A protein has these predicted regions:
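Alpha-helical solenoid repeat scaffolds
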Residues: 1-189
Length: 189
């Protein structure tokens, strides 16, 4: 019972953090959460508390700590990249910083591209996908690269998802020939 109350208390404290919260307080709360997780590794709220560390860093807009965070699954990887991208997109105050922000955003989109290329299906990532696509990230060559990877893994569902992704976009850069080749890959599986 007491552990449930402590977990709820930690979760409530995370919700009060914002960009003006002193770093010492943010770090102390993060340490408390990590200690609780370590001491109560089988607690039913463990996943929620692990997520609350991520939420804490986003609320505090602590990009350095976010960069050090190692997500343990694809969904969290996408969430971390999205948070980093949102923070970089909102930090456009000075000209010198804009160049740095652009480099950081490009690096984030490059990480996203690697996830897109190497995974059949990604969790909801509309903001990153849109930014990546609008900057010319998804080329015909990359579509073929992903299709070959999926074909090599005998991933018929992944090829189907990729083909549907092509159908969804109006005025897509890809031509009908790419879609036809994807269809052939699917037929071979």
């Amino acid at each position: 019972m007491q552990t449930d109350a402590i977990a709820a208390y930690l979760d409530a404290r995370v919700k009060t953090v914002n960009r003006d919260t002193p770093r010492e307080d943010v770090n102390a709360l993060k340490a408390e959460i990590e200690q609780f997780i370590q001491q109560h590794s089988s607690h039913f709220l463990r996943g929620k508390l692990e997520q609350s560390i991520f939420t804490l860093l986003i609320n505090a807009e602590d990009t350095q700590a976010l960069a050090k965070l190692t997500p343990n699954n694809l969904e969290r990887q996408i969430a971390v990249l999205t948070a980093k991208y949102q923070i970089e997109a909102s930090n456009t105050s000075q000209t010198a910083e804009n160049q740095s922000n652009d480099k950081n955003k490009s690096a984030i989109l490059s990480e996203y591209e690697q996830l897109w290329l190497n995974n059949a299906e990604l969790p909801n990532d509309a903001q990153l996908w849109t930014a990546w696509y609008s900057q010319g990230g998804r080329t015909e060559e990359k579509i073929y690269q992903k299709a070959e990877m999926l074909f090599g893994k005998n991933d018929a569902k992944g090829l189907e998802i990729l083909a549907k992704e092509l159908e969804k976009i109006e005025n897509a850069k890809e031509d009908e020939q790419v879609a036809a080749h994807l269809s052939l890959y699917q037929d071979l599986l």
